[in-house]
Design a protein with these regions (language model features):
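Double-stranded beta-helix
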Residues: 4, 56-57, 62, 115-150
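Short strand-coil-strand connectors
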Residues: 55, 92-96, 119
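Short acidic-glycine-tyrosine-enriched beta hairpin
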Residues: 94-111
Length: 150
């Protein structure tokens, strides 16, 4: 593997053995509660496991229980695209609100305010794209450390 692609840092919510791999057996990994750095009274709104990490991308699966809602926030360092795998959420993106159901896809560009409210138990697959190549450092700062599930 080219040395420029090697990830030396630990990735929060990703098992250490899975870092910098071309194939990740994530089906054998457990999710962990996440409390993002913008949270107020959101004690583990999502349960997350990182599926893949590179310098520019973080791909994760997130479970959110019915009724859980995060506060309106935005990210200045990355774009997000999400696929709703299960359930239903009310998704506010900028000034628009959408009801997102299983099979739907949505995005919130860098710097755009957004908020999720789980109307049913929900699972999404989210891809965060960091154009500056600081995905791991930014992800670890967002989620408050390097919880790896070891």
């Amino acid at each position: 593997m080219d040395a420029s692609t090697v990830i030396a840092d630990m990735v929060a919510f990703m098992h250490p053995d899975d870092c910098d791999q071309l194939f990740v057996p994530s089906s054998t990994r457990e999710s962990m509660p996440l409390v993002p750095n913008y949270a107020l009274n959101e004690d583990g709104v999502d349960s997350v496991k990182v599926l893949m990490a590179t310098r520019n991308l973080i791909v994760f699966e997130a479970f959110r229980p019915k009724g859980a809602v995060d506060r309106t926030h935005m990210h200045a360092d990355h774009h997000s695209v999400a696929y709703q795998k299960m359930g239903r959420v009310r998704m506010m993106i900028d000034a628009d609100t959408y009801i997102v159901e299983a099979g739907d896809t949505y995005r919130h560009p860098m710097g755009v305010k957004h908020q999720h409210e789980a109307l049913l138990d929900s699972i999404r697959i989210e891809i965060k794209y960091y154009p500056d190549g600081n995905a791991i450092e930014s992800w670890n700062a967002l989620v408050g450390g390097t919880h790896t599930g070891e």
